[in-house]
């Protein structure tokens, strides 16, 4: 069941959308594009993939995704530091980019949409949905 609110699409969800994964497209239609956002961190990760591939098609896809969704360009540095410290105290680790995305979701009260639920579930108070399961 979908939680109603504003959704922050993680990088893997954007990639699934570009690959036209039916469950992601269905959920996006259900909640509406206007209720979905992305982080500039996600855009950076997508551009990294495009640079790595050297494919003009991939650059065009990133441009299309970044123009489709409103993005958050603010990096919540203090929240990132708090998340990182809490995880380190527990002996847990996730990638820096994921912590920046999580910090945005927590500060803006957004629901993260990701297939990477193992990492994100380590962060207390984070609302998570996986649109790739259904």
What does each of the following model-derived ranges do?
Residues 113-115:
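Catalytic beta-strand/loop signature of glycosyltransferases that borders the donor
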Residues 2-9, 25-111, 127, 133-134:
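PIN-domain endoribonuclease scaffold, especially VapC-family toxins
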Residues 14, 43-46, 120:
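A generic structural signal for short hydrophobic patches within well-formed alpha-helices
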Residues 107, 117-119:
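C-terminal structural segments of small proteins and small subunits
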Residues 15-16, 92, 118:
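Flexible, active-site-adjacent loop/turn segments at secondary-structure boundaries
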Residues 18-21:
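Short gly/ser/thr-rich secondary-structure transition/capping motifs
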Residues 102, 119-120:
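Positions that flank functional sites
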């Amino acid at each position: 069941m979908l939680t109603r609110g504003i959704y922050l699409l993680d990088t893997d969800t954007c990639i699934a959308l570009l690959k036209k994964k039916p469950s992601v497209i269905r959920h996006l239609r259900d909640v509406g594009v206007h209720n979905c956002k992305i982080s500039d961190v996600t855009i950076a990760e997508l551009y990294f993939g495009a640079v790595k591939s050297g494919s003009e098609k991939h650059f065009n896809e990133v441009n299309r995704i970044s123009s489709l969704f409103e993005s958050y360009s603010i990096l919540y540095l203090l929240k990132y530091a708090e998340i990182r410290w809490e995880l380190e105290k527990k002996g847990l680790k996730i990638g820096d980019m994921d912590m920046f995305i999580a910090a945005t979701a927590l500060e803006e009260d957004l629901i993260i949409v990701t297939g990477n639920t193992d990492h994100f579930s380590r962060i207390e108070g984070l609302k998570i949905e996986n649109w790739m399961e259904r």
